[in-house]
Amino acid sequence: TTKNLPATMRFFSEITGVKYPYPKYSQAFVEDFGGGMENISATTQIIEIIHDERELLDDDSESLQSHELAHQWFGDYVTTRDWGQIWLNESFATYMQAMWTEKLKGHDEFLYSDVRNNQNTVIQTWNSGNRRPVVTKYFADKDAMFDNYAYPGGGSVLHMLRKHLGDELFFRSLKHYLTRNAHQPVST
């Protein structure tokens, strides 16, 4: 389940231009937990993502593992000024997860499983009448900020930005964003 974690960490360090920012990285797998939660140098994740060799034929935990690891850069090393800016943490982690899919499984899988699904999720959310800007301070309840606009919506925005800027400028911009704002809160 965690065998690709060192490669994921190296990949994220390479594409951001920022070496993994902490001296260690730990993970805990627990029951009765909703997905994953990053903390500085430590992540808690649901135990159901641990798969044996047979289960790995049908499913893997790469998306959750890479998403939570990406938060070490986008969420911990650089974090948001307030909850209205949560998209900066979640969309970058979502898009980093997508780029790990691209590295691991190829460009077609990246486009189909991540980019297309992110865009379709946002379109369906919008069409269902749940509409809001990516950045907002107004939520129906405290959990509403962790929605389809913060995760796949923001990830879609980052993909559009990458396509507009081109890879060289996009990745140079990631490095600038992280190094300029290291250990500081940011806003859009």
Regions from the PLM with identified roles:
Residues 1-188:
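Hydrophobic alpha-helical and helix-loop surface patches within well-folded domains
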